[in-house]
Amino acid sequence: MLFRSAIPGLPQKSGKVRDVFDLGDKLLMVVTDRISAFDVILPCGVPDKGKVLNQLSLFWMEFFGMKNHLVTANVDEYPAELKPYKEDLRGRSMLVKKVKMVEVECIARGYLTGSGWKEYQKSGTVNGMKLREGYENASKLDEVLFTPTTKAAIGDHDEAINFAETVQLVGEKTAALLRDTTVSLYSKAADYARERGIIIADTKFEFGLDADGSLILADEVLTPDSSRFWPVSSYAVGKNPPSLDKQYVRDWLDSINFNHQPPGPVLPDDVISRTREIYLKAFKDLSGREIV
């Protein structure tokens, strides 16, 4: 298990799960086995989680064929200065181009659940958009919704923004491109996943901008950390389906009345073990592969 990575001499920034090292013209992204919930990094890791996130992101980048920030994920092709760390990096890292990241998190919702369901119950809206009456928890939406948020610093919460606010942040052309690309990628992935027995209820994409203004798919793509995955076999409208994602950990934390503030509690061994099983199953069901 890798909870924290360190490469002496290289500038480093750490997110909730990823450690990013600056190599000058490129970045090394290392996906650790850390896990966060409710924007709180928990003090224990989940073995193989980082490998699942990294390798599933690589799978989807290949699947979409869209321009992305990947240079290589083959550690044998990494710069010589990384050679001493090769085995720690294998399977859980990628070398990527530096791109100008768009400061909007792009969420696609195909089903009404989570915060969207809570808002709909109160006001009949999701992200301020009025929806028809009659939806239940976990209902499939009539159309895929684009519900962007701001990008918050670690420990802070992302704030939902509407399309007009997205335009104010990034301009009308880029906002429309973010919306259309997010919905298109989600729809393509959702059709594929359903054939593999998984419903993608919602997911989050992040994009960068190339020098010519075109979008680049970046960061993580359709992982159990950034998505809600439901088995088709146990899906039913009106109740929360069991999930193949981080929801299992969130539910356990709520069951012990965790207040969603740091420090987070240590997860029991059985919760860690079950979380690992969930992540590995999501990877295998979606990709048809085993992690390496």
Task: Describe every region a protein language model picked out.
Residues M1-T149, H260-V266, D270-V292:
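Active-site loop/lid in soluble adenylation, ligation, and acyl-transfer enzymes
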Residues T32, L89, K188, L215-P224:
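Catalytic cores of nucleic-acid ligases and guanylyltransferases
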Residues K97-V99, E195-T203, G208-D210, R276:
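Short, active-site-adjacent segments that bind or coordinate small-molecule cofactors and metal centers
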Residues A108, I200-V221:
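Conserved metal-phosphate-binding beta-hairpin within the catalytic cores
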Residues S139-E172:
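A short mid-domain helix/strand-loop element embedded in enzyme catalytic domains
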